[in-house]
Amino acid sequence: MGVYTHKFKTPFEYGGATYEELTFNFERLTGRDMVAIETEMQMNNEYALAPEISRNFQSKMAARAAGIGSDVLDAMPLPDFNRITNAARDFLLSTGY
């Protein structure tokens, strides 16, 4: 549950890169990552009262876990975005959040 590999049905292209799969290593994230995500959101006047139900928070967390920008996730087709953010949510819940 701490590592999720997402395989795209068709390659996803964004910013000159083509993605066939992405691996999200949620286990490598630290408390600093959580705080950094919250800080980034606050700087943009975005808030997550409950990260486990905030798609915005989950997408930023997933981006960090994969080492990509959150803009990459935001540009994905909705089914892929949903599966990836669901994996982030499941990880948060598994850690007792």
Language-model features: locations:
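Short, surface-exposed, charged amphipathic helix/loop patches that serve as local interaction elements
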Residues: 2-97
